[in-house]
Amino acid sequence: MSSVGLVLGGGGITGAAYEFAALMAIRMATGWNPDDADIIIGTSAGATVAAVTRANRLTIETLTGGDHGRTEYVEHMNQFLLRRTRPTGFGRWVRHGLLPGLRKPGLEMTLGGPAPFDPAGIADYVEHLAGPLAREWPEKTTLITAFDLLDRRLVVFGSDDAPATSLGEAVAASSAVPMVYQPVEINGRPYVDGGVASGTSAHLVFEHAKNPLDFILIIAPMASEGERTNARFYEGIFDRLGSESLSRELEIIEATWPETDVVVLRPDAAVLAAARPNPMSVEQTIPTFLRTLAFLRRELAESHVWDLLEEHLS
C-alpha cells in the first residue's frame, strides 16, 4: 500500500466544489478513500474539504445539502458562508495592511481590512458538514494553514508549532479571505486566509510527514495554467501567483523526495467558465461540480495521470 499525501488548495466556494468533484471522481475510478491519505494539507476552500474528508462525509448529499431545490440550496449555503456582519477593524487595517502595503504595494494591502461577512458562519458550516469532528481535531495527520496577521507569517494548525484549536475554528481562519471575511481570533491573535502565503503550501508535506511518501496528489483550483475567454483581469493575477508558488513547492518536493510521484489537478477552461469570475458564488457551486466531473473523465484517462493513480491508489 502506497503512502499518500493529499494537498487541497484554495479557490473560494467554487474551488471547494471543484475539489469535491475531483476527490469523488478519483474515489469512483480507483476505489481509494481520500480519508486514507497519510497526511492532508488544506488551505482556505481546501481546508473545508479536508475537514469533510477526515469526517468521511465526502458525498453528493454533503455537497448539496440533501433534497433542496436550487433556490433553497442557495439560501441554505448563504446562511453559513455569506453571513452578514458590521464591518469593523479600520485601525487594524491601517496598521497591518494599508501602511505596510504603501511601503510594498501588493495584495497584502488588504490584510485585516473591514469586511462584510462573519467567518463564524464558516465554522458553523464545517460543523454542519463534518459533525462532532469540527469541535475536535482528526487523529490522522491533518494540517490547516492560516496567516498570522500580527507576525505576518504562515501558521500551520495541527502542527506542534501552532496554538491548539478546533478543526472548525482552524478552517474558518484559513478561509477568512481579506476584505471578504473579518479576521478570526484564536487565542487572542487575528488570522486570515492561508492563501495569503500560498494557495497550496504543498511543501508542508515533506516538512510534516513522518517518512518520505510514495505519492502526492495536489488539487489546485487557483493555479490554472490556461487562459479563460473574457476573463476578468484579476483572474490571471491569482492564477499566476498560485502557479508560481506551486512551481516553487514542486521543486522543493522533487529535490527533497526525488522518488515521490506527484499528480497536480488544475481546472480547465470549461470548469473556469463556471467557477469564475466570482469564486465566492454559491449559485455556481453545482455547475462547477458538474463541469469538473466531465473534465476529470478526460483528465484521469490521460496515461501520465491514470498510470500513477492506478499504481498508488487502486
Regions of interest found by a model, annotated:
Residues 1-43, 48-314:
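Patatin-like phospholipase
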